Amino acid sequence: MLNPTVSEMPHFEEDGPAQPAPYVTIVLPCFNEQEHVVKEVERICAAMDASNRTYELLAVDDASTDDTLALLREAEPLFPHLRVISFGHNGGAGTVRRIGTQRARGQIVVWTDADMTYPNERIPELVDLLAANPDIDQVVGARTQESGTHRLLRVPMKWLIRKLAERLTNTRIPDLNSGLRAFRREVSLPYLRLLPPGFSCVTTITLAFLSNQHLIHYVPIDYAKRSGTSKFHFVRDAYRYLLQVLRMVMYFNPLKVLMPLALWLLGIGTAKFVFDQVREPLYIPNNTIMLLTSGLIVAAMALLADLIVRSRDGA
């Protein structure tokens, strides 16, 4: 597992004498959320206090340029289960979640956002589902509506990416990149090194679990309008989501991506070869040779990539 570099290592105060490990760790990334971060902390702590679960709330300030960190430090003495971690420079949502999960002391890790969009009062419900069903390794809050920015562009693009992910994993995925989820920390540890620094980290953890036959359960949730300014950039982040879906499936099952392409090229090349021979026997045009050669090369790459994956998993 990769370790964080010195420049991205978080800073936090020592907790004093060792305390019993909680059952749940909630990782809350915070970046320029001064208007509502304390309200979010209050809402999460109130919900968890009302449950029968021991917990810690890990609020990670990702080098905010406003008063987010100062407000968290002020709130820390008021909430006994709150731990505040600060980054020296902005590492991204994926870096926050990765390091937060690595530093978590709970058996169950919860990811959510601090922008008031997710119903964090339902976190105990997600935890209870995991606790009651040992066969389930992750519970995801599946949003029933899209309330984010660039809605006209985001909805069709996310639908296409989600359908591609479903096709490549042979699994129905109601919400590919929901930010509210609970999972077993021990199961997630081998996949944390795969998390990218940006928003596509949630897509990555979903595909990592599905590609390795870890059962994911989806719970319908409401999704509120975001408080404050969105950090989502449509073109850049949509491209990263699509690239990450392909990268993750290539990492775990490259035959799913490469072999269909190889078969298409070989099929078209073969049909073109037959057509060429009927039209002019013993003549093979350059484009026919290119199609057949490309198909063979891609097929060889697919088999080699699959061999590498099997060798890696067996090591």
Predicted regions, residues:
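A conserved acidic beta->alpha catalytic loop
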Residues: 61-70, 116
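Short beta-strand/loop segment that forms part of the nucleotide-sugar
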Residues: 53-63, 85-86
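Hydrophobic targeting segments
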Residues: 22-28, 37, 44, 55-60
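Hydrophobic helical membrane-anchoring modules
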Residues: 2-23, 200-315
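Acidic helix N-cap motif at the loop->helix transition within catalytic regions
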Residues: 35-39, 66-75
